[in-house]
Amino acid sequence: MAAALPWSITASTILAVFWIVALALSPYARYVGRELKTVWGALPVALWALAALGTLWSSEPDWTERLKALDDFHRLWAIPFLIAQFRVSSYGRQVLIGFLISCTALLVLSYLTYFVPSLTWRWSRSDGVPVKDYIAQSGVFVLCAFGLLVAAIKSRSDGRNAAALGLLVLAFAFLANVTYIATGRTAIVVMIGLLVWVSLRHSNWRYGSLGIVLGCALLATTWTTSPYLQSRLLTLWNEVQSYHPNERTEASAAVRLEFWRRSIMIIEEAPWLGHGTGSIRTQFEKTASGQKELTALVTQNPHNQIFAIAIQIGVPGSILLVLMWIAHLWLFRRGDSFSTIGSMVVVQNIIGCMFNSHLFDFTQGSLYVVGVGVIGGIVLRGDAAERPLLRNAPA
């Protein structure tokens, strides 16, 4: 399932169904109850439960749309199930390695389709993006790059210099793809955020500050040598400057600002209960009635996860979301490499959710769920390696 995630929504969905059935029939199922008693396992389910209740008071008249909106929350159930499985299974590392190998294969194909455009097939969005879209691809590649950097640091500290060098080269191959070939602008913000996070978390203040300085120097070098990156970021500034509610524009940043402005208005109308699960489009249609230009736009996605949840199930839903993020950061509070990578999954999602509804997007949402679930299980398995419960557990 994890290996299919960078490539295909359909394949990932089919494999997820097989995984659910297999897990239900396996010895791991009996450990799920334990994880539901923890904050990191209970909060995702609590958020889902509130969304399920939200279907009862939704302003969306069509029950099909209400239940369809609830689908966006279903994947949260996978977090306690994955943690339960990989807290007792020894195959967590193999899952991560399989994911990395899959992403590396996609990286190679991305370079091939960029430098040899004739290899690009008809359903590709652009050169260098062989499957899905550049937003999903750059998000996956950024996480791989920083995960490899953490692994390289660990290898270097263990005296495995050749392995550290190889991991470092592969990490820069991922970063080069993001900065020179295909990137989402959110991915650039995530890169900066992860650079600061890893530098301060993985080192003391002295070396952390040095890491930030070196990272800034690298970003400056990339900026001066990548016209593509310059174009993406300068366009963002121009789009923000072009924003005016009563003027027509197709600039994505301006559209986001308008969606955020109207989201706040919608939330203020029903801050405590929200307008119900599935109500986003209905509420935007209401605010667009009789309007023109940007104010007449209607969307199902306000491009901010906190707003997307607050519109439907109120401020309490957004509070549950933030508490879930905090609980998952707490799960990865230790200083080992797996905890650092797990915390990066959470930080990436937090930053991404400021500009998109990433928990509701298939690739980004599944990446968060699988990352927290699998790595969380690995970390807890390491913490509890000497406990009697695990001595007779299935491997």
Question: What do the predicted segments below correspond to?
Answer:
Residues 1-64, 87-101, 151-165, 206-209, ...:
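Transmembrane signal-anchor hairpin modules in multi-pass inner-membrane enzymes, especially those
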Residues 2-19, 32-38, 49-76, 85-94, ...:
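Interfacial transmembrane-helix termini
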Residues 312-347:
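Hydrophobic transmembrane alpha-helices and their immediate junctions
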Residues 246-261, 265, 269, 273-313:
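Long extracytoplasmic/lumenal interhelical loops at the membrane interface
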Residues 52, 81, 91-123, 130-205, ...:
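Alpha-helical transmembrane segments of multi-pass inner-membrane proteins
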Residues 18-23, 191, 195, 324, ...:
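Transmembrane alpha-helices of multi-pass inner-membrane enzymes
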Residues 181, 202-247, 251, 259-269, ...:
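A membrane-periplasm/extracellular boundary helix in multi-pass inner-membrane enzymes
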Residues 10-27, 69-80, 136-145, 188-196, ...:
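Membrane-embedded alpha-helical segments of multi-pass membrane proteins
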